[in-house]
């Protein structure tokens, strides 16, 4: 009986170690891929062959790696292009808002989210992000109004419904 328990323990422990090693290898590969992609895009930018999409991809990678200030620089470079359409501008401003909120620069995040909504008034994600910032700043009335606006554009939005009921219950 002791041999069985010992064998079971060894097998179980080995499986846990293998799972951890597998997870670590995947994370290293993912990080390595992102680093190689950053190098490729930087080289392309340095050679002045980069497009707005390349800057956007680079900024998105920086966000994944939580390098927010570098991502912000790349998005601001994209904004220098005067040929962007409204949807591109809205996406960039929404991303800038996300970057600022991740750095707890809530006032600047609010400005960027409002700019995104200026270009696309029914941009649901920007409205939800803006409502979330209002919640973080304890501006309950503004958050409620923003979630209600989300429901005007998307009446079936479950996140907005849930958040709205939570905030309303907190106020009561």
Curated annotation (Swiss-Prot):
TPR repeats lie at residues 52-85, 90-123, 124-157. It is found in: Plastid, Cyanelle. Signal peptide: none annotated. InterPro entries: TPR-like_helical_dom_sf (IPR011990), TPR_rpt (IPR019734). One of its GO terms (cellular component) is cyanelle. It holds the Pfam family TPR_12. It comes from the Eukaryota. Keywords: Cyanelle, Plastid, Repeat, TPR repeat. Its main location: plastid. Gene3D superfamilies: Tetratricopeptide repeat domain. Belongs to the ycf37 family. This is Uncharacterized protein ycf37. It comes from Cyanophora paradoxa.
């Amino acid at each position: 009986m002791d041999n069985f328990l010992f064998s079971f323990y060894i097998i179980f422990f080995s499986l846990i170690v293998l799972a951890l090693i597998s997870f670590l290898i995947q994370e290293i590969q993912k990080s390595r891929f992102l680093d190689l992609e950053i190098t490729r895009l930087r080289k392309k930018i340095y050679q002045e062959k980069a497009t707005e999409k390349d800057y956007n991809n680079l900024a998105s990678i920086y966000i994944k790696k939580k390098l927010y200030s570098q991502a912000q620089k790349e998005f601001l470079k994209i904004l220098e292009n005067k040929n962007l359409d409204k949807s591109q501008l809205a996406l960039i401003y929404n991303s800038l808002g996300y970057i600022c909120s991740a750095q707890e620069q809530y006032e600047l995040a609010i400005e960027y989210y409002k700019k995104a909504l200026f270009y696309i008034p029914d941009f649901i994600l920007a409205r939800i992000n803006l409502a979330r910032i209002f919640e973080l700043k304890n501006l309950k009335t503004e958050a409620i109004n923003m979630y209600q606006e989300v429901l005007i554009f998307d009446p079936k939005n479950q996140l907005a419904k849930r958040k709205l009921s939570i905030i309303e219950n907190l106020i009561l």
